[in-house]
Amino acid sequence: MMQSADRAAGRSTGRTGSLGGTGITDRICLVIPYYEAGDDLVVSLTSVRMRRTDLIIVVDDGSQQRPARNLIPPTVADTPVRLIELEKNSGITMALRTGISSAPGDFAFIARLDCGDTCHPERFSTQRDFLSRHPDIVLVGSWVDFVSPDGSFLYRLEQPVDPTAVRKRMRVNCAITHPAAIFRREAYDHAGGYPTAYPAAEDYALFAQMLKHGDAANIPQSLVRCRTGDGGISDKKRRTQLVSRCRILLKHFDGHPMAVYGLLRAIGQMATPRRWSTWAHRIRVKLTGQ
C-alpha cells in the first residue's frame, strides 16, 4: 500500500519547489474544533498518537452546556493539549482559522480531526513521513472507514491516490476527506486559509486553492474512522453545501469535461433527496471502492 502511494507522489506535477523545503521542523499541530460534543471529544483524543514535541489544539466554539475545559487532559499520550475558548459560537470555519493561527510558527504541518472521529495509531507517523519524503506534496489524506453512530462499519471511502487522479476528482468533488487531512502550514498560508464564503464546504474551497501551490495525494490505507448518519453537517446543510460546491467548481472551472460533469452533477444533486444520493454513493463505493 505505502509503495503505491510513493509511486503516485513520484508522478506529481511538481508545482511547488519551496513549500516543502523551508527547513522548519516536521512537527504537527492537530486542530480539533469543538462545540457541545461532550464525550465525543474524549473518544477522538484517546485515539491520537503523536510525538511529545507535537501539539493538539482544541478550539471550543462557544460551548455553554458542555465546555471542553471540563473534558480535555493536559496531555494525550505525552502530547500537550492546548485549549482555545471562543466567546460565542462562530462556526467551524472561524474555529479552524483561530486554531491554525495559534499554532507555533515553526510547526511545518497542520492536521485535522473532528469530534467523534478516531485515528489509526500510525496515522500521524505515516503522514508525517510521507510529507517529509515528498516536498512537492502540500496536502495528504488517506482512505477512510465510515461507521454508524454505534460504531458499525458502513463502507470504506478509497479516495484517489495519484496526484493526477486527485486533481481530476477535485473537478467533481473534494478528493481529500477533511478529518484525514494533513497539510503544509506554508501552503495553507499561501492559499489564504479557510475561506468564509463557502459554508459547509470550507475544506473543498481551501484544498482547491492549495492545489495552485502544490500537489495532493492520498495514502492508500484507512488511517481514520469517521462517524456518519447522526445529523452531521452533510445531513443538516446539504443544500448549502451543494450551493457552495457549485460556486467552488465555477471559480476553478477550466473547461475540462470532468469539470463540466462535476458542475452538472452538483446541480442535479440539489434536486435529489438525500437518501437517494446516499444509496447511490454506497452502491458506487461497493462497485468501485471510490
Predicted regions and their residues:
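Short, well-formed alpha-helical segments that are part of the catalytic scaffolds
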Residues: 37-50
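A conserved acidic beta->alpha catalytic loop
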Residues: 60-71, 88, 114
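Glycine-rich, basic loop-to-helix element that forms the pyrophosphate-binding segment
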Residues: 86-104, 126
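Short beta-strand-to-loop acidic/aromatic patch adjacent to the donor-nucleotide binding site
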Residues: 107-118
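Conserved donor NDP-sugar-binding/catalytic core segment of glycosyltransferases
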Residues: 122-154
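Catalytic beta-strand/loop signature of glycosyltransferases that borders the donor
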Residues: 143, 204, 217-223
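Catalytic core of nucleotide-sugar-dependent glycosyltransferases
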Residues: 167-169, 226-229, 235-259
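Acidic donor-binding loop at a coil-to-helix junction in glycosyltransferase catalytic cores
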Residues: 199-206
